[in-house]
Amino acid sequence: MLLGFFRLLFKGLYRVRLTGDTQALYQQKVLITPNHVSFLDGILLALFLPVRPVFAVYTSISQRWFMRALTPIIDFVPLDPTKPMSIKHLVRLIEQGRPVVIFPEGRISVSGSLMKIYDGAAFVAAKSQATIVPLRIEGAELTPFSRLKGLVKRRLFPRIQLHLLPPTHLPMPEAPRARDRRKIAGEMLHQIMMEARMAVRPRETLYESLLAAQDRFGARKPCVEDINFQPDTYRKLLTKTLFVARILEKYSQPGEKIGLMLPNAGISAAVIFGAIARGRIPAMMNYTAGVKGLSSAIAAAELNTIFTSRTFLDKGKLWHLPEQLTQVRWVFLEDLKGDITLADKLWIFAHLLAPRLAQVKQQPEDAAMILFTSGSEGNPKGVVHSHKSLLSNVEQIKTIADFTANDRFMSALPLFHSFGLTVGLLTPLLTGAEVFLYPSPLHYRVVPELVYDRNCTVLFGTSTFLANYARFANPYDFYRLRYVVAGAEKLQESTKQLWQDKFGLRILEGYGVTECAPVVSINVPMAAKVGTVGRILPGMDARLLAMPGIDQGGRLQLKGPNIMKGYLRVENPGVLEAPAAENQHGEMEAGWYDTGDIVTFDEQGYVRIQGRAKRFAKIAGEMISLEMVEQVALGASPDKMHATAIKQDASKGEALVLFTTDNELTREALLRYARQHGVPELAVPRDIRWLKQLPVLGSGKPDYVTLKNMVDEAETTHE
């Protein structure tokens, strides 16, 4: 009677809905593992699960008065993690056929993300061999009974959903010591909990995700700021988005691919979301690629119009691009204000009241944006991403990192760079954090000063950029930082040590590729290992393809929701080439993407990058990583830049060419370092060429295409 009354009350107030297959709850041995977001969680499960479970409640909570008051509707047993007998009691209950609920986090989330997972829950699952039923509670974190005050827009009676996920099992790990078995089991349960979060992510478009963020964090919450130092709230960003959306319709057609050549600025975010809302597909133009690279991008994506800014072209000294790229129409944002009419203003006002109506009909699987590869190994390729792939990567990042609305991101990597777009714009916008968009990562004195002035807590960049920020920064500039993330190139040991010594900060290294939107793996405070790029993100499958001549590791192939829709190539303009990869049997498998990177996995699942498959030289029958050669050069000459190319050799097949900005670097110095660090002599180049400055791409990576051309030209001249 009492249970029925409370069930009706909660259903009326919170519109509680239970989804998923409930049959798993009736199996012989069941362990239910929900996330923990509010004080309502236990009551919700007791009221709406079709079985009457036993709740494991920590003794510090079970002894409070309100737990005694809940005794008529909730069965619970005290859990003391310091006493093994309480764990054994839970195992016995499961073996007797009672469904048991354990909150693996052990406490209510204070970030909105998963907290750490206690090993005890995992050990109970493994010891009892119970069927694990993951459960996601969504919506209760918005109530006053959560611990997210100030992080979300709380409301009295939000809609609450209880998602039952497909059942799984957790085998008892094999390890000599019980402590190790518990730890491994805990990591396995953590993976299950992360996969559960990914499984219930909403099906929405990028524009809908912006509206959802506004609803979750509040229309008046500041979200974007740029060098004008006028922060935009979600409401103001939406207003700009609708303005741009309305005007873009006059210059493009639904479904058309349009080029965007814009700096890191608040208006750029509005243009991206505005174009997407009205069914246009923004192609982010890499203005550092030069006329040749941009011509390839324009041809591959079949672009007719590029939107840019006169101010941006003036400050960036980029007017030569529209002057030479005459095959497209150039539209300047400054000219659009004059096109606004009374009808347009009325349309914008009406859609501010009902913003969802501004979006043309779209599906999450539809093409949303086009990014371009760097062209470091040939012509730039258009990488077409769907709403689903981009938002999946954001959700993967949110699942493993505890970013909150209290964070402030410093985003200086360009938005045409996948790292800059997903991590630098979409992730902060959709987690309620505020982002400061700065137009150039090369201003090594300015960026640290802005990090200090704007109280930024998250900074990311390439190893090169982070090293230069550290050189010019005051030791106190980064006092608020809690995440420093390196990606896009290998993190140098000297950079890591400099940040540790000067600022007391640990750089977290990650790995990504444009085709994966881009983050594939990353170290986070909860799971980090020196010398690796972290674990593969939840929701992704990974496999290694064996490579002849390479004993350790193989080519990394990936499959998951964040994989691109496909390539657009200049050789076949406008035709989408869906991802497919060759498996170990020599067959092409659709949906898999071959990264071309040689990696290894350790026993804990951490990834180590060995190098690009294309960046291996076969010398006297041995496979030599060009990246290893560059690491030797950096070890011998840490303050200079180095890059390696390959030339043909009559006696050994291939030979190494080292380009360096150190005019005093000798082979003897390289040999000395190689011998000290166990590097084979074959990896020490004989051909060392000095350059005043290495050719680099906009991302800061060496331009290997140009370097290879320099080698080939020299060989031709020599012949």
From Swiss-Prot:
It catalyses: a 2-acyl-sn-glycero-3-phosphoethanolamine + a fatty acyl-[ACP] = a 1,2-diacyl-sn-glycero-3-phosphoethanolamine + holo-[ACP]; a long-chain fatty acid + holo-[ACP] + ATP = a long-chain fatty acyl-[ACP] + AMP + diphosphate. It comes from the Bacteria. GO terms for molecular function: acyl-[acyl-carrier-protein]-phospholipid O-acyltransferase activity; ATP binding; long-chain fatty acid [acyl-carrier-protein] ligase activity; medium-chain fatty acid-CoA ligase activity. Residues 233-646 are annotated as: AMP-binding. The active site is at 36. One of its GO terms (cellular component) is plasma membrane. It comes from Klebsiella pneumoniae subsp. pneumoniae (strain ATCC 700721 / MGH 78578). This is Bifunctional protein Aas. The chain crosses the membrane at residues 258-277, 409-433. PROSITE patterns: AMP_BINDING (PS00455). The keyword Aminoacyl-tRNA synthetase does not apply. It is a multi-pass membrane protein. The lineage of its organism: Bacteria, Pseudomonadati, Pseudomonadota, Gammaproteobacteria, Enterobacterales.
